[in-house]
Amino acid sequence: MFEIKKICCIGAGYVGGPTCSVIAQMCPKIQVTVVDVNEARINAWNSDTLPIYEPGLKEVVESCRGRNLFFSTSIDDAIREADLVFISVNTPTKTYGMGKGRAADLKYIEACARRIVQNSNGYKIVTEKSTVPVRAAESIRRIFDANTKPNLDLQVLSNPEFLAEGTAIKDLKNPDRVLIGGDDSPEGQKAVRALCAVYEHWVPKEKILTTNTWSSELSKLAANAFLAQRISSINSISALCEATGADVEEVARAIGTDQRIGNKFLKASVGFGGSCFQKDVLNLVYLCEALNLPEVARYWQQVIDMNDYQRRRFASRIIDSLFNTVTDKKIAILGFAFKKDTGDTRESSSIYISKYLMDEGAKLHIYDPKVPKEQIILDLSHPGVSEDNQVSRLVTISQDPYEACDGAHALVICTEWDMFKELDYERIHKKMLKPAFIFDGRRVLDDLHNELQVIGFQIETIGKKVSAKRIPFASSCEIPKFSLQDPPVKKPRV
Protein backbone atom coordinates (compact mmCIF):
# COMPACT_ATOMS: atom_id res chain seq x y z
CA MET A 1 0.00 0.00 0.00
CA PHE A 2 1.18 3.51 -0.84
CA GLU A 3 2.31 5.28 2.33
CA ILE A 4 1.82 9.01 2.79
CA LYS A 5 4.90 10.55 4.41
CA LYS A 6 4.58 14.20 3.40
CA ILE A 7 1.43 16.30 3.20
CA CYS A 8 1.02 19.75 1.67
CA CYS A 9 -2.10 21.81 2.35
CA ILE A 10 -2.79 24.77 0.07
CA GLY A 11 -4.72 27.30 2.14
CA ALA A 12 -3.98 28.36 5.73
CA GLY A 13 -7.48 29.43 6.69
CA TYR A 14 -10.14 28.21 9.11
CA VAL A 15 -10.11 24.71 7.60
CA GLY A 16 -6.54 24.11 6.44
CA GLY A 17 -4.77 25.43 9.52
CA PRO A 18 -6.65 23.53 12.25
CA THR A 19 -7.09 20.35 10.16
CA CYS A 20 -3.41 19.98 9.34
CA SER A 21 -2.34 20.95 12.85
CA VAL A 22 -4.36 18.06 14.26
CA ILE A 23 -3.06 15.67 11.57
CA ALA A 24 0.52 16.66 12.46
CA GLN A 25 -0.12 16.12 16.17
CA MET A 26 -1.80 12.76 15.64
CA CYS A 27 0.69 11.54 13.00
CA PRO A 28 4.15 12.52 14.28
CA LYS A 29 5.91 10.57 11.51
CA ILE A 30 4.15 12.52 8.74
CA GLN A 31 5.59 15.90 7.73
CA VAL A 32 2.79 18.43 7.23
CA THR A 33 3.36 21.76 5.47
CA VAL A 34 0.60 24.38 5.24
CA VAL A 35 1.17 26.93 2.48
CA ASP A 36 -0.55 30.15 1.50
CA VAL A 37 0.07 33.12 -0.78
CA ASN A 38 -0.74 35.47 2.11
CA GLU A 39 2.63 36.12 3.74
CA ALA A 40 1.11 37.97 6.71
CA ARG A 41 -1.13 35.01 7.47
CA ILE A 42 1.80 32.56 7.33
CA ASN A 43 3.85 34.85 9.59
CA ALA A 44 0.98 34.81 12.07
CA TRP A 45 0.87 31.00 12.04
CA ASN A 46 4.58 31.04 12.84
CA SER A 47 4.12 33.49 15.72
CA ASP A 48 2.59 33.40 19.19
CA THR A 49 -0.51 35.19 17.86
CA LEU A 50 -2.31 32.81 15.50
CA PRO A 51 -4.40 34.37 12.70
CA ILE A 52 -7.60 32.70 13.90
CA TYR A 53 -9.10 32.10 17.33
CA GLU A 54 -10.17 28.56 18.10
CA PRO A 55 -10.23 26.95 21.58
CA GLY A 56 -7.32 24.51 21.93
CA LEU A 57 -5.73 25.39 18.58
CA LYS A 58 -2.73 27.22 19.98
CA GLU A 59 -1.77 24.26 22.17
CA VAL A 60 -1.99 21.87 19.21
CA VAL A 61 0.12 24.11 16.96
CA GLU A 62 2.78 24.68 19.62
CA SER A 63 3.06 20.95 20.28
CA CYS A 64 4.29 20.14 16.75
CA ARG A 65 5.25 23.38 14.95
CA GLY A 66 8.87 23.18 13.84
CA ARG A 67 8.92 19.42 14.41
CA ASN A 68 6.61 17.97 11.77
CA LEU A 69 4.29 20.95 11.22
CA PHE A 70 5.45 23.86 9.06
CA PHE A 71 3.84 27.01 7.67
CA SER A 72 5.34 28.46 4.50
CA THR A 73 4.81 30.63 1.43
CA SER A 74 7.00 28.28 -0.67
CA ILE A 75 4.01 26.71 -2.38
CA ASP A 76 5.76 25.12 -5.35
CA ASP A 77 8.42 23.44 -3.21
CA ALA A 78 5.82 22.02 -0.84
CA ILE A 79 3.78 20.63 -3.74
CA ARG A 80 6.83 18.98 -5.32
CA GLU A 81 7.82 17.22 -2.10
CA ALA A 82 4.33 16.09 -1.05
CA ASP A 83 2.77 12.65 -1.41
CA LEU A 84 -0.65 14.16 -0.75
CA VAL A 85 -1.90 17.68 -1.45
CA PHE A 86 -4.99 19.06 0.27
CA ILE A 87 -6.81 21.84 -1.58
CA SER A 88 -8.28 24.02 1.16
CA VAL A 89 -8.88 27.38 -0.50
CA ASN A 90 -11.90 29.65 -0.46
CA THR A 91 -14.85 28.87 -2.74
CA PRO A 92 -16.93 32.05 -2.36
CA THR A 93 -20.31 32.68 -3.89
CA LYS A 94 -19.98 34.36 -7.29
CA THR A 95 -20.66 38.09 -7.27
CA TYR A 96 -20.74 38.50 -11.04
CA GLY A 97 -21.83 36.80 -14.26
CA MET A 98 -23.76 33.56 -14.59
CA GLY A 99 -24.87 32.17 -11.25
CA LYS A 100 -24.20 35.47 -9.46
CA GLY A 101 -25.28 35.30 -5.83
CA ARG A 102 -25.67 31.50 -5.82
CA ALA A 103 -23.02 29.53 -7.72
CA ALA A 104 -19.62 28.79 -6.18
CA ASP A 105 -16.67 30.63 -7.68
CA LEU A 106 -14.04 27.97 -8.39
CA LYS A 107 -11.25 30.22 -9.67
CA TYR A 108 -9.03 29.41 -6.67
CA ILE A 109 -9.65 25.67 -7.09
CA GLU A 110 -8.68 25.92 -10.76
CA ALA A 111 -5.56 27.91 -9.92
CA CYS A 112 -4.53 25.23 -7.40
CA ALA A 113 -5.10 22.44 -9.92
CA ARG A 114 -2.91 24.15 -12.52
CA ARG A 115 -0.18 24.83 -9.99
CA ILE A 116 -0.23 21.25 -8.73
CA VAL A 117 0.09 19.67 -12.17
CA GLN A 118 2.85 22.13 -13.08
CA ASN A 119 4.92 21.18 -10.03
CA SER A 120 4.26 17.44 -9.83
CA ASN A 121 6.03 14.33 -11.03
CA GLY A 122 5.35 10.67 -10.35
CA TYR A 123 2.47 9.56 -8.11
CA LYS A 124 0.56 12.05 -6.00
CA ILE A 125 -2.85 12.19 -4.31
CA VAL A 126 -4.79 15.45 -4.65
CA THR A 127 -7.66 15.87 -2.20
CA GLU A 128 -10.50 18.39 -2.13
CA LYS A 129 -10.94 19.81 1.37
CA SER A 130 -12.81 22.90 0.25
CA THR A 131 -16.58 22.69 -0.09
CA VAL A 132 -17.18 22.38 -3.82
CA PRO A 133 -20.09 21.73 -6.19
CA VAL A 134 -20.79 18.20 -7.30
CA ARG A 135 -18.38 17.04 -10.02
CA ALA A 136 -15.73 19.64 -9.18
CA ALA A 137 -13.27 16.74 -8.94
CA GLU A 138 -14.02 15.99 -12.58
CA SER A 139 -12.99 19.55 -13.50
CA ILE A 140 -9.74 19.13 -11.58
CA ARG A 141 -9.08 15.82 -13.32
CA ARG A 142 -9.69 17.38 -16.75
CA ILE A 143 -7.04 20.01 -16.02
CA PHE A 144 -4.64 17.26 -14.94
CA ASP A 145 -5.35 15.17 -18.03
CA ALA A 146 -4.90 18.14 -20.36
CA ASN A 147 -1.50 18.93 -18.85
CA THR A 148 -0.18 15.43 -18.29
CA LYS A 149 3.46 14.46 -18.73
CA PRO A 150 5.44 11.19 -18.68
CA ASN A 151 5.32 9.23 -15.42
CA LEU A 152 2.80 11.65 -13.86
CA ASP A 153 -0.06 9.97 -11.97
CA LEU A 154 -2.39 12.32 -10.07
CA GLN A 155 -5.35 10.77 -8.23
CA VAL A 156 -8.21 13.03 -7.13
CA LEU A 157 -10.15 12.41 -3.91
CA SER A 158 -12.90 14.23 -2.04
CA ASN A 159 -12.46 14.55 1.73
CA PRO A 160 -14.79 17.32 2.96
CA GLU A 161 -14.46 18.75 6.45
CA PHE A 162 -17.38 18.68 8.88
CA LEU A 163 -15.84 20.70 11.70
CA ALA A 164 -17.70 23.55 13.36
CA GLU A 165 -15.93 26.77 14.22
CA GLY A 166 -15.67 27.13 17.97
CA THR A 167 -15.36 23.37 18.44
CA ALA A 168 -12.98 22.62 15.55
CA ILE A 169 -10.24 20.90 17.55
CA LYS A 170 -12.75 18.73 19.39
CA ASP A 171 -14.48 17.87 16.11
CA LEU A 172 -11.19 16.99 14.40
CA LYS A 173 -9.94 14.80 17.23
CA ASN A 174 -13.25 13.04 17.77
CA PRO A 175 -15.22 13.28 14.51
CA ASP A 176 -18.69 11.85 13.97
CA ARG A 177 -17.31 10.50 10.71
CA VAL A 178 -14.54 11.00 8.17
CA LEU A 179 -15.79 10.91 4.58
CA ILE A 180 -13.49 9.98 1.69
CA GLY A 181 -14.70 9.78 -1.89
CA GLY A 182 -12.73 8.36 -4.80
CA ASP A 183 -12.94 6.54 -8.11
CA ASP A 184 -14.03 2.91 -8.18
CA SER A 185 -10.94 2.11 -10.28
CA PRO A 186 -7.99 0.22 -8.72
CA GLU A 187 -5.93 3.43 -8.84
CA GLY A 188 -8.69 5.39 -7.14
CA GLN A 189 -9.14 2.80 -4.40
CA LYS A 190 -5.38 2.73 -3.82
CA ALA A 191 -5.52 6.47 -3.10
CA VAL A 192 -8.56 6.05 -0.84
CA ARG A 193 -6.78 3.38 1.23
CA ALA A 194 -3.70 5.59 1.60
CA LEU A 195 -5.74 8.50 2.96
CA CYS A 196 -7.74 6.17 5.22
CA ALA A 197 -4.44 5.03 6.74
CA VAL A 198 -3.64 8.62 7.76
CA TYR A 199 -6.92 9.04 9.65
CA GLU A 200 -6.66 5.58 11.20
CA HIS A 201 -3.87 6.93 13.42
CA TRP A 202 -6.64 8.26 15.69
CA VAL A 203 -10.07 7.69 14.11
CA PRO A 204 -11.77 4.27 14.54
CA LYS A 205 -12.14 2.46 11.22
CA GLU A 206 -15.92 2.24 11.57
CA LYS A 207 -16.10 6.05 11.52
CA ILE A 208 -14.26 6.32 8.20
CA LEU A 209 -16.81 6.21 5.39
CA THR A 210 -15.83 5.69 1.77
CA THR A 211 -18.02 6.59 -1.21
CA ASN A 212 -17.64 7.54 -4.83
CA THR A 213 -16.37 11.06 -5.44
CA TRP A 214 -19.73 12.58 -6.38
CA SER A 215 -21.50 11.23 -3.28
CA SER A 216 -18.80 12.71 -1.07
CA GLU A 217 -19.07 16.14 -2.69
CA LEU A 218 -22.87 16.19 -2.47
CA SER A 219 -22.86 14.89 1.12
CA LYS A 220 -21.03 18.01 2.28
CA LEU A 221 -23.55 20.34 0.64
CA ALA A 222 -26.46 18.27 1.90
CA ALA A 223 -25.12 18.17 5.48
CA ASN A 224 -24.85 21.95 5.70
CA ALA A 225 -28.22 22.39 4.01
CA PHE A 226 -29.89 20.08 6.55
CA LEU A 227 -28.30 21.93 9.49
CA ALA A 228 -29.31 25.32 8.10
CA GLN A 229 -32.80 23.95 7.46
CA ARG A 230 -33.23 23.00 11.13
CA ILE A 231 -32.23 26.48 12.27
CA SER A 232 -34.65 28.12 9.84
CA SER A 233 -37.37 25.69 10.89
CA ILE A 234 -37.11 26.53 14.59
CA ASN A 235 -36.78 30.23 13.76
CA SER A 236 -40.04 30.08 11.83
CA ILE A 237 -41.68 28.62 14.93
CA SER A 238 -40.15 31.41 17.05
CA ALA A 239 -42.17 33.98 15.11
CA LEU A 240 -45.32 32.00 15.80
CA CYS A 241 -44.42 31.76 19.50
CA GLU A 242 -44.05 35.52 19.80
CA ALA A 243 -47.47 35.99 18.22
CA THR A 244 -49.24 33.45 20.44
CA GLY A 245 -47.49 33.61 23.82
CA ALA A 246 -45.77 30.24 23.47
CA ASP A 247 -42.07 29.87 24.34
CA VAL A 248 -39.90 28.51 21.52
CA GLU A 249 -37.45 26.99 24.04
CA GLU A 250 -40.26 24.93 25.55
CA VAL A 251 -41.49 23.94 22.09
CA ALA A 252 -37.95 22.96 21.05
CA ARG A 253 -37.52 20.85 24.18
CA ALA A 254 -40.87 19.14 23.60
CA ILE A 255 -40.17 18.19 19.99
CA GLY A 256 -36.47 17.52 20.58
CA THR A 257 -37.21 14.67 22.97
CA ASP A 258 -38.71 12.80 20.03
CA GLN A 259 -35.85 10.52 18.99
CA ARG A 260 -36.89 10.83 15.37
CA ILE A 261 -36.20 14.57 15.56
CA GLY A 262 -33.49 14.99 18.21
CA ASN A 263 -32.57 18.16 20.07
CA LYS A 264 -29.56 19.46 18.16
CA PHE A 265 -29.76 22.67 16.11
CA LEU A 266 -33.12 23.61 17.62
CA LYS A 267 -31.87 26.82 19.23
CA ALA A 268 -33.85 29.78 17.97
CA SER A 269 -31.77 32.88 17.30
CA VAL A 270 -31.40 36.01 15.22
CA GLY A 271 -30.22 33.77 12.36
CA PHE A 272 -27.34 31.60 11.22
CA GLY A 273 -24.10 33.00 9.82
CA GLY A 274 -20.60 31.82 9.00
CA SER A 275 -18.82 31.02 5.79
CA CYS A 276 -20.64 27.77 4.96
CA PHE A 277 -24.37 27.58 5.54
CA GLN A 278 -25.66 30.34 3.27
CA LYS A 279 -22.99 29.73 0.63
CA ASP A 280 -23.62 26.00 0.48
CA VAL A 281 -27.41 26.23 0.46
CA LEU A 282 -27.27 28.78 -2.36
CA ASN A 283 -24.85 26.51 -4.19
CA LEU A 284 -27.35 23.68 -3.81
CA VAL A 285 -30.14 25.93 -5.11
CA TYR A 286 -28.09 26.83 -8.17
CA LEU A 287 -27.20 23.19 -8.79
CA CYS A 288 -30.88 22.21 -8.70
CA GLU A 289 -31.82 25.00 -11.10
CA ALA A 290 -29.02 24.01 -13.47
CA LEU A 291 -30.28 20.41 -13.42
CA ASN A 292 -33.85 21.54 -14.15
CA LEU A 293 -35.17 20.76 -10.66
CA PRO A 294 -37.02 24.03 -9.91
CA GLU A 295 -39.24 22.59 -7.16
CA VAL A 296 -36.19 21.33 -5.26
CA ALA A 297 -34.44 24.67 -5.78
CA ARG A 298 -37.41 26.60 -4.37
CA TYR A 299 -37.54 24.29 -1.34
CA TRP A 300 -33.94 25.01 -0.36
CA GLN A 301 -34.18 28.71 -1.25
CA GLN A 302 -36.81 29.03 1.46
CA VAL A 303 -34.16 28.13 4.08
CA ILE A 304 -32.24 31.29 3.10
CA ASP A 305 -35.39 33.39 2.82
CA MET A 306 -36.42 32.42 6.36
CA ASN A 307 -32.98 33.35 7.69
CA ASP A 308 -33.20 36.75 6.01
CA TYR A 309 -36.70 37.21 7.40
CA GLN A 310 -35.56 36.40 10.95
CA ARG A 311 -32.87 39.09 10.81
CA ARG A 312 -35.23 41.71 9.39
CA ARG A 313 -37.90 40.77 11.92
CA PHE A 314 -35.48 41.14 14.84
CA ALA A 315 -34.27 44.55 13.64
CA SER A 316 -37.86 45.68 13.12
CA ARG A 317 -38.70 44.56 16.65
CA ILE A 318 -35.86 46.70 18.03
CA ILE A 319 -37.10 49.76 16.15
CA ASP A 320 -40.74 49.18 17.10
CA SER A 321 -39.91 48.76 20.78
CA LEU A 322 -37.84 51.95 20.84
CA PHE A 323 -40.98 53.98 20.05
CA ASN A 324 -40.66 53.41 16.33
CA THR A 325 -37.47 55.42 15.91
CA VAL A 326 -33.79 54.82 16.60
CA THR A 327 -32.45 57.93 14.88
CA ASP A 328 -29.53 59.37 16.88
CA LYS A 329 -30.14 56.85 19.67
CA LYS A 330 -27.16 55.03 21.12
CA ILE A 331 -27.54 51.26 20.84
CA ALA A 332 -24.98 48.80 22.24
CA ILE A 333 -24.27 45.79 20.03
CA LEU A 334 -22.75 42.98 22.12
CA GLY A 335 -21.06 40.40 19.92
CA PHE A 336 -19.97 40.68 16.30
CA ALA A 337 -18.63 37.19 15.50
CA PHE A 338 -21.15 34.88 13.84
CA LYS A 339 -21.03 32.56 16.88
CA LYS A 340 -19.18 32.28 20.17
CA ASP A 341 -15.63 30.94 20.51
CA THR A 342 -14.51 32.25 17.14
CA GLY A 343 -13.34 35.55 15.69
CA ASP A 344 -14.95 34.81 12.32
CA THR A 345 -17.45 37.44 11.17
CA ARG A 346 -18.35 36.06 7.75
CA GLU A 347 -22.11 36.40 7.13
CA SER A 348 -22.54 37.29 10.81
CA SER A 349 -26.07 38.35 11.73
CA SER A 350 -24.46 41.27 13.58
CA ILE A 351 -23.50 42.78 10.22
CA TYR A 352 -27.09 42.65 9.02
CA ILE A 353 -28.59 43.99 12.25
CA SER A 354 -26.02 46.80 12.30
CA LYS A 355 -26.80 47.66 8.68
CA TYR A 356 -30.55 47.84 9.32
CA LEU A 357 -30.06 50.05 12.40
CA MET A 358 -27.55 52.31 10.63
CA ASP A 359 -30.05 52.80 7.83
CA GLU A 360 -32.42 54.17 10.50
CA GLY A 361 -29.75 56.53 11.84
CA ALA A 362 -28.88 54.66 15.06
CA LYS A 363 -25.52 55.31 16.72
CA LEU A 364 -23.96 51.90 17.33
CA HIS A 365 -21.39 51.09 19.99
CA ILE A 366 -20.06 47.61 19.25
CA TYR A 367 -18.14 45.23 21.49
CA ASP A 368 -16.80 41.74 20.79
CA PRO A 369 -14.11 40.00 22.86
CA LYS A 370 -12.35 38.34 19.89
CA VAL A 371 -13.08 40.39 16.77
CA PRO A 372 -10.52 43.17 16.10
CA LYS A 373 -11.74 46.73 15.58
CA GLU A 374 -10.31 46.73 12.06
CA GLN A 375 -12.40 43.70 11.08
CA ILE A 376 -15.63 45.24 12.37
CA ILE A 377 -14.98 48.49 10.49
CA LEU A 378 -14.07 46.55 7.34
CA ASP A 379 -17.26 44.47 7.47
CA LEU A 380 -19.51 47.48 8.04
CA SER A 381 -17.72 49.52 5.35
CA HIS A 382 -18.58 46.95 2.67
CA PRO A 383 -20.20 48.84 -0.26
CA GLY A 384 -23.39 46.83 0.13
CA VAL A 385 -23.66 47.55 3.86
CA SER A 386 -23.04 51.26 4.27
CA GLU A 387 -22.65 54.42 2.23
CA ASP A 388 -20.09 57.21 2.21
CA ASN A 389 -19.14 58.19 5.78
CA GLN A 390 -21.97 56.29 7.45
CA VAL A 391 -19.66 54.07 9.52
CA SER A 392 -17.43 56.91 10.73
CA ARG A 393 -20.52 58.89 11.78
CA LEU A 394 -22.55 56.12 13.38
CA VAL A 395 -20.20 53.38 14.62
CA THR A 396 -17.93 53.33 17.67
CA ILE A 397 -15.93 50.26 18.71
CA SER A 398 -15.97 49.85 22.49
CA GLN A 399 -13.23 48.34 24.64
CA ASP A 400 -15.61 46.58 27.02
CA PRO A 401 -19.36 45.91 27.29
CA TYR A 402 -19.88 48.48 30.04
CA GLU A 403 -18.45 51.24 27.89
CA ALA A 404 -20.70 50.15 25.02
CA CYS A 405 -23.82 50.31 27.22
CA ASP A 406 -23.04 53.61 28.96
CA GLY A 407 -25.80 56.04 28.00
CA ALA A 408 -27.45 53.59 25.61
CA HIS A 409 -31.17 53.27 24.97
CA ALA A 410 -30.81 49.53 24.38
CA LEU A 411 -28.33 46.69 24.33
CA VAL A 412 -28.60 44.05 21.63
CA ILE A 413 -26.97 40.63 22.08
CA CYS A 414 -26.00 39.22 18.69
CA THR A 415 -23.40 36.59 19.70
CA GLU A 416 -23.83 34.03 22.48
CA TRP A 417 -20.54 34.71 24.28
CA ASP A 418 -20.63 33.13 27.76
CA MET A 419 -19.26 36.32 29.31
CA PHE A 420 -22.53 38.11 28.55
CA LYS A 421 -24.24 35.92 31.17
CA GLU A 422 -21.84 37.17 33.85
CA LEU A 423 -22.12 40.94 33.32
CA ASP A 424 -23.15 43.25 36.17
CA TYR A 425 -26.53 44.21 34.75
CA GLU A 426 -27.46 46.38 37.71
CA ARG A 427 -24.39 48.50 36.94
CA ILE A 428 -25.33 48.56 33.26
CA HIS A 429 -28.94 49.57 34.01
CA LYS A 430 -27.85 52.54 36.12
CA LYS A 431 -25.85 53.95 33.21
CA MET A 432 -28.50 53.43 30.51
CA LEU A 433 -31.32 55.76 29.52
CA LYS A 434 -34.75 54.73 30.79
CA PRO A 435 -36.69 52.74 29.84
CA ALA A 436 -33.66 50.49 29.31
CA PHE A 437 -34.14 47.70 26.77
CA ILE A 438 -32.39 44.36 26.29
CA PHE A 439 -32.85 42.59 22.95
CA ASP A 440 -31.51 39.07 23.35
CA GLY A 441 -30.94 37.68 19.87
CA ARG A 442 -29.30 34.51 21.21
CA ARG A 443 -31.36 33.78 24.34
CA VAL A 444 -28.25 33.77 26.52
CA LEU A 445 -30.08 35.55 29.36
CA ASP A 446 -33.06 33.20 29.70
CA ASP A 447 -32.17 32.27 33.29
CA LEU A 448 -31.89 35.93 34.29
CA HIS A 449 -35.20 37.30 33.02
CA ASN A 450 -36.86 37.67 36.43
CA GLU A 451 -33.76 39.27 37.93
CA LEU A 452 -33.39 41.64 34.99
CA GLN A 453 -37.02 42.71 35.18
CA VAL A 454 -36.67 43.43 38.90
CA ILE A 455 -33.68 45.64 38.06
CA GLY A 456 -35.95 47.49 35.63
CA PHE A 457 -35.04 46.23 32.16
CA GLN A 458 -37.56 45.85 29.37
CA ILE A 459 -36.65 42.49 27.80
CA GLU A 460 -37.32 41.37 24.25
CA THR A 461 -36.07 37.93 23.27
CA ILE A 462 -36.40 35.55 20.34
CA GLY A 463 -39.48 33.32 20.44
CA LYS A 464 -41.00 34.56 23.70
CA LYS A 465 -43.05 37.41 25.12
CA VAL A 466 -41.31 38.71 28.25
CA SER A 467 -42.03 42.38 28.88
CA ALA A 468 -45.75 43.06 29.21
CA LYS A 469 -45.13 46.81 28.92
CA ARG A 470 -44.08 46.66 25.30
CA ILE A 471 -45.91 49.20 23.15
CA PRO A 472 -46.95 47.62 19.84
CA PHE A 473 -46.87 50.08 16.94
CA ALA A 474 -49.45 49.40 14.27
CA SER A 475 -47.27 50.90 11.55
CA SER A 476 -44.33 48.53 12.06
CA CYS A 477 -41.38 49.47 9.86
CA GLU A 478 -40.86 47.30 6.82
CA ILE A 479 -37.16 46.54 6.41
CA PRO A 480 -36.11 45.63 2.85
CA LYS A 481 -34.20 42.48 2.04
CA PHE A 482 -30.44 42.72 1.91
CA SER A 483 -27.55 40.40 1.06
CA LEU A 484 -23.81 40.89 1.28
CA GLN A 485 -23.72 39.37 -2.22
CA ASP A 486 -25.92 42.13 -3.68
CA PRO A 487 -24.24 44.92 -5.65
CA PRO A 488 -24.37 48.26 -3.83
CA VAL A 489 -27.30 50.50 -4.68
CA LYS A 490 -26.51 54.18 -4.41
CA LYS A 491 -29.37 56.33 -3.14
CA PRO A 492 -29.88 59.60 -5.05
CA ARG A 493 -28.62 62.65 -3.21
CA VAL A 494 -31.29 65.14 -2.20
Curated annotation (Swiss-Prot):
Binding locations of NAD(+): 11-16, 36, 41, 89-93, 130-132, 165, 276-279, 346
Notes on activation and inhibition: UDP-alpha-D-xylose (UDX) acts as a feedback inhibitor. It binds at the same site as the substrate, but functions as allosteric inhibitor by triggering a conformation change that disrupts the active hexameric ring structure and gives rise to an inactive, horseshoe-shaped hexamer.
Residues engaged in binding substrate: 161-165, 220-224, 260, 267-273, 338-339, 442
Keyword Ion transport: no
Disordered: annotated segments: 88-110, 466-494
Active site: E161, K220, C276
Keyword set includes Magnesium: no
Catalysed transformations (reactions): UDP-alpha-D-glucose + 2 NAD(+) + H2O = UDP-alpha-D-glucuronate + 2 NADH + 3 H(+)
A UniProt-annotated Pfam family: UDPG_MGDP_dh
Keywords associated with the record: Allosteric enzyme, Carbohydrate metabolism, NAD, Oxidoreductase
Functional note: Catalyzes the formation of UDP-alpha-D-glucuronate, a constituent of complex glycosaminoglycans. Required for the biosynthesis of chondroitin sulfate and heparan sulfate. Required for embryonic development via its role in the biosynthesis of glycosaminoglycans.
Subunit structure of this chain's protein: Homohexamer.
Name listed for the protein in its UniProt record: UDP-glucose 6-dehydrogenase
Lineage: Eukaryota, Metazoa, Chordata, Craniata, Vertebrata
